[in-house]
Structures are given as structure tokens and as C-alpha cells.
């Protein structure tokens, strides 16, 4: 038996994080019965001579939460998990917490577009026992001591709503301090003052000057303490980074004149300063290029995989100018960037000496290809691509006999990695890169399968919660929300639309399903209640009809069923989609309140029931689907048609019995009886047949469609849908050479041409939501029901002769659970590994239920 992956709030040995609650989690490897209890203890002493808190798991999940009110500032804590004669120990350390800041915000007089350096020299005559640096900048920053960069993270402090919170970082600098020490910062524009937002963007969104605040706390071996603060004595200078922008890239000129600026103490509040929630952005992988010349005779680096990150190289000769431009694709054999819109995505180096190691600092790129000027081919082959993402464990592995399916799963994972950088972005390359909520609503379940997302999503939910507080509970289309005056853009002037807004319920719900973290759920439960309450208040103001047939809706975004080429609007009735999500969000909220034994759950349970009943009353006549309901002439539909006219000059057809409409009704049980269900299934079969088994769904329907097909008995239709290779399909993208998932089903046409440039990313994760179907239905790993006291994992694979074998391994809340199956004549050989302290049962093809023991379980099944 082995204990591993000890984490506090989803982070291993967190230093200086915000601890509004404490959740201790771990994994077990080995055969241990679920009835064995695990004990967790917390102490200030490494010997655990005094126990500050202890608790025992009351479930079969390896996780336990408690309040954090016993924590003290700037204190290292030891914690251990133990049972029988086995234990494992880890640590966590608090930040300044609520201690007042003695440091001052510092900046400079005048104006500059350049990057800025802040520095201060210190002398230490005594031996240092322990030292911590607490700091943050307005703008992205890197910090060095004696010219050595601190830590492995980049793009600090990440992206958050600067007007609502400002997260500071804590560094252990004990080993860095010598007798004469210089602490230096380089601060760029970043999201704080650099160009950001679509349609050309805005500058100086949060401020027009970089700023810094820093405190160095030193404890010496003689027991004395000293603290050093940012103030007017710090030196402020320009540096070699002449230009930097999230969208446009970075320019470094080593001949640029370094100017000393006048240091200025700025009267800025420290009330928004809070310990970090954001995970560090780190290099997770390095890739090496194939060098070739395109049809325009331009030198191109092909890294074979689309990534988010930058390049790194060491110059072999003096260079007057080297230019790198980053793009996603080739067109007609040539480098192509038109789909980036206004984003330049360039890295330029000027007047560099031989031996200089170069990389960007305050930007990142979405790319597979790099156009290079100023290097020889021998020099270009030494360029390394470094993939950046927020630091998270990957938690799912997949393999099968179908290489195309394997590539699809890889593409989904890469799109998640590429877009999980500080916040969950829509895309990493064009002039957008924003935290769109709708993408995450449909993808959050898959995201939690692929990675340990608790801390990452906690940071995003904090931003979402703060933005929601400004909107009376409505959820914005993206978070953070840049506060700019742009009445032309409807996404900035509106909030509270179905699917997008439902990120407020889907993210907390899916986090709890996967990780059973009650502390995290308590912290962000208000996201759920505030969002549903907001919908409820709008509903009540219109008479309490329990239909969401009002307001501004996007419907089934990017669906193909309108028949209008290039349109972003699908044909499914927006009121049907919105009302279904009204029901789902109320239901999820009720369930999470029940988990926390909160008696408010009954209100939301009743609300969900009322919404469901109204949906059935509106969209069914007896057991027949009503294809001409009153909602087709509703406020929401009129607004949607107006949007279609304003943003495309088209009229959108509207229907109920689309693939999306039918899939949503079926998957979420929104029908009056089994006869009605059977008729929905028949109609869905007809809709699939109309399109030769291909999908026509958009954001709202794609995740539900394969589940609805299989759960309705259309098993082969569901699996055939997954494995189709022509457009529109998931594997068509693979056939076209994709290494990430696309924003549109037709981002690239069968002839290899890009379908358009206005809104066409090759690195969007939303349609990767199909992965949860692969895990839950094809492999057959189904998480315990959130309200099921038996806490039982259900293993129920769906075999198909189109695949010889399939294997999936999931790092659950308890440890690795793997399922593999292989066809063997008329039999299927099934191999299942269950982690310790885990209850699981297998459901065979003929319906037999078999409880599984921790460890290996082998059995035979049959295929139908």
C-alpha cells in the first residue's frame, strides 16, 4: 500500500496560497477495503508533538475538509494522513493573510511604452534562517535575485479582475540571499495595461503605468527578524524589452538606451491584495522543429503540434535582427495568419550578441508553425518550442485499436492544455483569448476527467463570483470582464444568457462529482444560488411562467442546422434551450445544497420540478412533441432574429425537433412519459438519417447528442457518429491533420482551405466535450451519483465491433481506476483495476451486476 499525491485545496505543498477552507486529499495504491478509515492531522511541528486539528474520513473518498480559522499568518504547517502503520507527510504555508502591508506601491513619473525594471540592493551581515518575498505587480512580471530568475513560473501574476482582486505571490528566497543581494523585477504590460479585447482591443484597461509592491521578510539564525519594503529608494529603469503585448508579441533590442526614471510612490489601496489563488504558469513540454521552406520560400519551423507558449534558443552568432512570427496553419503550402485577425503574434530580437539565450517574457502565442527571418537553417533547427499551461496533473489516459480515435483524445487534451493558462480561454492565438463561460459549461465535465482542476477552477470561480456580484447575480459571457465603454459590443453590454451563464452551476457541480471537495463546494455555492435566483427573479417579474422565453440568448451557437453558410446561429428554439438549462441549473443547485445538508435545497428542487412541468406542458401535446409551441413567437426568439439581422443580415429558421432539441429533451428527461420518450427517440433517429448519421449540433447540443443516442437504445448510431471521418465530425478534423480541436465543424474545408477568417480558431476545446461520452459510455467509467450514499463507481462499457480494444485509466478521488476491454471471438475480455477504499460494480451486457474488489478484476462478457 502506498499513499501519494498529498494535496491541500488541490495543490501539492502550497506556499502562500489563500486558504478560505482546507481540503486535504491523497491517493492510495494497493488493496485496501473501503471500510478502513484514514486520519488526517495538522501541526506546526514536524514531529507532530502538538496537533492543531485532526479528522477522520467519513466516506470512502480520500478527502476531508475543514475550516481554516486556526491558521496564522506566515506559518508553515505539517500535515499527515495515516491508517494502521502507514503514513505520509506534506506541508503547506500561509501568506501574510490579513496582516497590513507596510510596503508602498511604487511606479515612475512620466510615460513610457517600454517594459520597466525595479531593483533594490540589500546587505545581510548575519546568517539567514528563512526568507520570504511577498510581491505582485500591476502588469506581468518576473523577479530575479542576483540576476537569477526566481521559480519555474512565468506570466505572473496571471490574469484576474484587477479592479476586484489583486493576487500576490510568495517566494521562498532563503537560499538566494547572500551578503550583498540585489532583488530585481522586470514588469511588462500584460492584461493590466496592454492591448486586450476583440475588435482591435483597448489599452490601459486597468491602468496606464506598471506598478510594484514588495516585502522581503528575513529571519536570521540568531532569532532576529528584519523586513524590507518597496519605497522611493528603489531604482526604476527602462530595459531591453521595447514592446510587449499579449496579442502582438514582444520586441527586445539589446542596443536600446537604458533610462533611469524617477521613482514615485503611488497612493493605491492595498485592500484588494489577496494571497494567490492562481496556479503558476509553467513550461510543461518542449518540442523540436522540422525546418522547411514554404511555397513563398519562407523558412518555416513545424513543431508538429499546436501549442500555447513561445520559443527558446541560444544564438550562435551576433544578430542584427531575428524575427519569429507564429501561426496555426499553412494555406497552399505557405505560412498563414489571417485568422489571427489583428493579433501580430511576433517575437523580434535586435542587436543580440553571440551566446545570448532568448525567449519572450510578457506574451504567449498559439501556434504550430513559426516563420523565421534572420537565422540560418542550421541555427533554426536548434529553436525549441516551450508549451505553457497552468500547472496541473493530468488524470486520464486513453488508448485503443483506432489510431484516429487516439489522436482525437490527444487533440482534446492538447486544446485543454493550451487554453488552461491562468484562466480557461476560448483560444490562445487570435485577438481574443478570453474566459468565455459557455465553452466551459459544456466542457467542464471533460476538463475534470483530464486534469486535477480544483485549484485552477477555484481561481476562475473567484473571478466569476466577483463579476457576478456586480451584475446582481447574472453570469457574464466571460470572466474577467474588462471594464471598458463599448456599447457596440453586445457581449460587454449584456449578461445572463443560458449555457454561458450556467457555468456558474456546471463548474461547481462537476467539480464536486469528480473530487468530492465539500470545502470548495461551500466556498462557491453562492455562484450557483445567485445565478438561479437571478433567472428566477426575471421569471417572476414576467409572471412566474417558468419558461425562459425572454432576454438575450445565443441558442445553439455555431450549429449547422440553420442551412445558412457561415452563420453562428443554430435553428433550435432558444426558449427550449434556455428553459432546459433553467431546469438543469435549478436541479444541480438543489443537489449541491442537499450534499451540504442545506435546507434551501427544497426550494430549488421545487423550482426545477415546476420548470420541468412547464417545459413538458409547452413542448408536448399529450405524448406528441409540439413542433409549433408559443415560444416560436416569444421575446427571446424575436431578439435572436434581430441579432441575426444585425450581425449577418439573415433570418434564422427555428424548430423544436432538431438534433439538439431532441437530444436535450431526451438526455435530461424532459418528456411526460415513456411513450413520449419512444416517439422522441424515433424522431431523433429520423433526424440522424436525414443527415446520413452526421451531426448538425452546436455548443448546446453536441455534448448531449451521443449520450442521448446511446441511452435511447441507438447504440450503433452513437458509436458510428463518434467514428465518422467525413465532415462534419470529430475524426474529420483528425483526417485533416488537426492536432487540437476546432472552433467550427468546418474550420477547414475538405479541400484544405480555411472556411473563413473572422471567427475561426483551430484550438477551441468546446467540441471536445465528446470525451466524457467516450469515458462514461465507451470505456464505461461512471462516477458515483452525488446523492448516492453507497458512493459506488459504476463500470458499464459499451462494446463495438468497430474497435478491437479500448483502455482508459482515470485518476479518481481515490487513485487509479482503469478499464480495458478486448474482443476475443464472440467474447469480450474485460480487465478492471479498482483503487483501495473504493466501491465499484460492473454491469454486464446482459444486465448482471458484479461488485468488484480493490485490485485486478478479470472477466468475460459478450457483445450484442
Show which residues each predicted segment covers:
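Heptad-repeat amphipathic alpha-helical coiled-coil interaction surface used
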Residues: 512, 583, 589-590, 608
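Non-catalytic C-terminal accessory modules of carbohydrate-active enzymes
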Residues: 202-206, 213-215, 224-256, 265-267, ...
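Active-site acid/base region of carbohydrate-active enzymes
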Residues: 140, 233-238, 380-411, 424-442, ...
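Alpha-helical support elements that line or immediately flank enzyme active sites
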Residues: 134, 310-316, 321-326, 362, ...
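Alpha-helix capping and helix-loop boundary segments enriched in small/acidic/polar residues
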Residues: 110-113, 132, 158-162, 172-174, ...
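Helix-terminus loop motifs that line ligand-binding clefts
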Residues: 152-157, 161-163, 332-342, 454-564, ...
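C-terminal capping/lid segments that line or modulate ligand- or cofactor-binding pockets
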Residues: 183, 252-253, 431-432, 447-450, ...
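Extracellular/oxidizing-compartment recognition motifs
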Residues: 1-76, 80-430, 438, 455-458, ...
Amino acid at each position: 500500500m502506498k499513499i501519494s499525491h498529498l494535496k491541500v485545496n488541490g495543490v501539492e505543498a502550497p506556499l502562500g496560497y489563500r486558504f478560505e477552507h482546507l481540503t486535504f486529499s491523497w491517493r492510495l495504491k494497493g488493496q485496501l477495503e473501503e471500510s478502513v478509515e484514514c486520519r488526517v492531522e495538522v501541526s506546526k511541528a514536524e514531529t507532530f508533538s502538538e496537533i492543531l486539528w485532526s479528522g477522520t474520513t467519513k466516506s470512502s473518498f480520500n478527502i476531508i475538509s475543514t475550516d481554516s480559522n486556526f491558521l496564522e499568518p506566515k506559518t508553515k504547517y505539517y500535515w499527515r494522513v495515516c491508517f494502521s502503520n502507514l503514513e505520509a507527510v506534506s506541508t503547506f504555508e500561509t501568506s501574510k493573510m490579513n496582516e497590513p502591508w507596510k510596503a508602498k506601491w511604487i511606479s515612475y513619473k512620466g510615460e513610457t511604452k517600454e517594459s520597466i525594471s525595479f531593483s533594490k540592493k540589500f546587505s545581510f551581515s548575519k546568517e539567514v534562517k528563512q526568507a520570504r518575498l511577498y510581491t505582485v505587480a500591476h502588469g506581468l512580471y518576473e523577479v530575479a535575485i542576483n540576476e537569477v530568475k526566481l521559480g519555474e513560473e512565468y506570466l505572473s501574476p496571471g490574469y484576474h479582475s484587477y479592479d476586484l482582486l489583486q493576487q500576490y505571490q510568495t517566494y521562498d528566497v532563503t537560499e538566494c540571499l547572500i551578503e550583498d543581494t540585489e532583488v530585481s523585477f522586470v514588469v511588462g504590460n500584460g492584461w493590466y495595461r496592454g492591448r486586450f479585447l476583440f475588435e482591435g482591443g483597448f489599452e490601459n484597461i486597468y491602468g496606464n503605468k506598471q506598478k510594484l509592491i514588495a516585502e522581503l521578510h528575513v529571519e536570521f539564525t540568531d532569532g532576529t527578524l528584519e523586513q524590507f519594503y518597496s519605497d522611493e529608494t528603489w531604482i526604476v529603469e527602462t530595459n531591453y524589452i521595447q514592446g510587449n503585448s499579449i496579442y502582438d508579441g514582444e520586441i527586445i533590442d539589446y542596443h536600446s538606451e537604458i533610462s533611469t526614471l524617477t521613482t514615485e510612490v503611488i497612493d493605491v489601496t492595498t485592500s484588494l491584495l489577496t494571497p494567490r489563488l492562481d496556479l503558476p504558469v509553467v513550461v510543461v513540454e518542449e518540442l523540436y522543429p522540422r525546418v522547411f521552406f514554404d511555397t513563398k520560400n519562407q523558412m518555416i519551423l513545424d513543431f508538429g503540434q499546436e501549442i500555447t507558449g513561445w520559443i527558446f534558443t541560444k544564438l550562435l552568432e551576433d544578430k542584427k535582427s531575428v524575427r519569429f512570427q507564429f501561426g496555426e496553419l499553412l494555406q497552399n503550402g505557405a505560412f498563414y495568419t489571417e485568422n489571427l485577425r489583428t493579433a501580430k503574434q511576433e517575437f523580434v530580437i535586435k542587436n543580440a550578441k553571440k551566446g545570448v539565450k532568448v525567449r519572450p517574457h510578457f506574451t504567449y502565442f498559439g501556434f504550430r508553425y513559426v516563420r523565421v527571418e534572420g537565422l540560418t537553417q542550421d541555427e533554426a533547427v536548434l529553436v525549441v518550442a516551450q508549451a505553457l499551461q497552468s500547472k496541473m496533473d493530468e488524470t486520464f489516459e486513453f488508448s485503443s485499436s483506432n489510431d484516429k480515435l487516439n489522436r482525437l483524445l490527444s487533440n482534446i487534451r492538447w486544446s485543454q492544455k493550451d487554453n488552461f493558462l491562468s484562466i480557461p480561454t476560448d483560444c490562445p492565438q487570435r485577438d481574443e483569448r478570453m474566459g468565455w463561460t459557455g465553452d466551459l459549461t459544456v466542457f467542464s465535465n471533460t476538463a475534470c476527467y483530464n486534469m486535477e482542476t480544483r485549484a485552477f477552477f477555484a481561481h476562475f470561480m473567484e473571478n466569476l463570483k466577483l463579476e457576478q456580484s456586480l451584475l446582481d447575480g447574472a453570469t457574464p459571457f466571460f470572466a474577467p470582464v474588462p471594464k471598458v465603454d463599448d456599447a457596440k459590443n453586445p457581449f460587454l453590454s449584456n449578461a445572463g444568457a443560458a449555457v454561458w451563464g450556467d457555468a456558474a452551476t456546471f463548474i461547481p457541480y462537476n467539480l464536486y462529482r469528480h473530487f468530492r471537495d465539500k470545502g470548495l463546494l461551500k466556498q462557491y455555492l453562492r455562484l450557483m444560488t445567485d445565478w438561479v435566483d437571478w433567472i428566477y427573479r426575471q421569471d417572476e417579474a414576467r409572471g412566474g411562467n417558468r419558461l425562459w422565453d425572454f432576454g438575450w440568448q445565443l441558442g445553439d451557437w455555431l450549429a449547422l442546422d440553420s442551412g445558412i453558410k457561415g452563420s453562428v446561429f443554430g435553428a433550435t428554439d432558444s426558449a427550449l434551450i434556455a428553459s432546459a438549462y433553467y431546469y438543469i441549473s435549478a436541479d444541480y443547485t438543489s443537489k449541491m445544497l442537499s450534499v451540504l445538508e442545506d435546507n434551501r435545497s427544497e426550494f430549488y428542487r421545487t423550482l426545477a420540478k415546476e420548470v420541468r412541468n412547464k417545459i413538458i406542458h409547452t413542448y408536448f401535446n399529450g405524448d406528441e412533441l409540439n413542433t409549433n409551441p408559443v415560444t416560436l413567437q416569444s421575446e427571446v426568439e424575436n431578439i435572436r432574429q434581430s441579432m441575426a439581422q444585425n450581425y449577418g443580415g439573415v433570418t434564422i429558421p427555428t424548430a423544436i425537433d432538431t438534433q439538439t432539441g431532441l437530444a436535450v429533451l431526451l438526455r435530461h428527461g424532459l418528456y411526460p412519459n415513456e411513450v413520449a420518450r419512444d416517439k422522441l427517440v424515433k424522431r431523433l433517429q429520423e433526424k440522424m438519417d436525414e443527415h446520413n448519421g452526421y451531426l448538425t449540433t452546436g455548443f448546446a447540443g453536441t455534448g448531449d447528442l451521443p449520450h442521448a443516442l446511446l441511452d435511447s437504445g441507438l447504440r450503433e448510431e452513437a458509436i458510428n457518429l463518434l467514428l465518422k471521418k467525413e465532415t462534419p465530425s470529430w475524426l474529420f478534423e483528425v483526417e485533416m491533420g488537426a492536432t487540437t480541436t476546432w472552433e467550427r465543424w468546418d474550420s477547414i474545408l475538405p479541400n484544405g482551405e480555411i472556411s473563413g477568417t473572422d471567427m475561426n480558431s483551430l484550438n477551441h476545446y468546446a467540441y471536445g466535450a465528446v470525451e466524457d461520452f467516450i469515458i462514461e459510455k465507451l470505456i464505461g467509467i461512471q462516477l458515483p451519483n452525488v446523492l448516492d450514499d453507497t458512493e459506488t463507481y459504476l463500470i458499464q462499457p459499451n462494446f463495438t465491433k468497430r474497435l478491437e480494444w479500448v483502455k482508459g485509466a482515470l485518476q479518481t478521488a481515490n487513485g487509479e481506476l482503469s478499464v480495458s476491454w478486448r474482443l476475443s471471438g464472440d467474447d469480450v475480455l474485460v480487465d478492471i483495476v479498482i483503487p483501495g477504499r473504493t466501491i465499484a460494480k460492473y454491469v454486464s451486457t446482459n444486465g448482471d451486476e458484479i461488485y468488484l474488489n480493490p485490485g485486478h478484476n478479470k472477466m468475460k462478457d459478450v457483445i450484442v
